Swiss-Prot record:
GO annotations of cellular component type: plasma membrane
Cellular compartments annotated: Cell membrane
Pfam families in UniProt: KdpC
InterPro entries assigned to the protein according to its UniProt record, in alphabetical order: KdpC
Annotated keywords: ATP-binding, Cell membrane, Ion transport, Membrane, Nucleotide-binding, Potassium, Potassium transport, Transmembrane, Transmembrane helix, Transport
Organism taxonomic ancestry: Bacteria, Bacillati, Bacillota, Clostridia, Eubacteriales
Keyword Hydrolase: no
Membrane topology, record value: Single-pass membrane protein
Record bears the keyword Transmembrane: yes
Protein name as it appears in the record: Potassium-transporting ATPase KdpC subunit
């Protein structure tokens, strides 16, 4: 009987600790210290929500900055109203497999075909490979700059203006030394459309 009482007490203590105290305290801390991130970092302009600055979106139109490759075809996973149910997933292909090599070669050819005049330039790796999650919101500065001529031509803008927007939404290295500078794809595209004006 003593063991049963101790077991029930342990269940109650851990239920209160793990089911109430821990979730409430982490939620309160997140709302106090990281309010924007805890609420999804949603980009909202004039009451309209355009997406999260922490999640990648697929842009395929030539007038937009393209992000990293997404592994799921959004068109395949829509509800009855046409709303996407799934945007991406990780790739399970081994980097050493022939199938992966073929896939990357196809992506390289596609990128080259849309970015004329850059045949001799190496394509930044993040334009032809996907990330672990498949939802990276950022690309490297090199990947963004590689696309400037195409975007400027499609939108009838100056290369300098497109570069200016890319520079505006480029973030530095973490703590100034880790990683590399990155460009937020959604923010650049919203700025190109004249929606985001910071």
């Amino acid at each position: 009987m003593k063991i049963i009482r101790k077991s029930i007490l342990a269940v109650l203590v851990f239920t209160i600790l793990c089911g109430i105290i821990y979730p409430v305290s982490t939620t309160v801390l997140a709302q106090v210290l990281f309010k924007e991130e805890a609420n999804g970092s949603i980009i909202e302009v004039d009451g309209k929500k355009y997406g999260s600055e922490l999640l990648g979106q697929q842009f395929t139109d030539n007038k937009y900055l393209w992000g990293r490759i997404m592994n799921i075809n959004v068109e395949m996973f829509k509800d009855s109203n046409g709303k996407p149910l799934m945007y991406s997933s990780p790739s399970n292909l081994s980097p050493a497999s022939e199938e992966y090599e073929k896939l990357v070669k196809e992506r390289v050819e596609r990128i080259r075909s849309y970015n004329k005049g850059k045949e001799e330039e190496p394509i930044p790796v993040d334009l032809v490979t996907s990330s672990g999650s498949g939802l990276d919101p950022h690309i490297s500065v090199a990947a963004a700059k590689y696309q400037v001529d195409r975007i400027a031509k499609e939108r009838n803008l100056s290369v300098d203006y497109v570069n200016e927007i890319i520079d505006k939404y480029t973030t530095g290295r973490f703590l100034g030394i880790f990683g590399e500078k990155t460009v937020n794809v959604l923010k650049v595209n919203l700025a190109l459309d004249g929606i985001l004006r910071e």
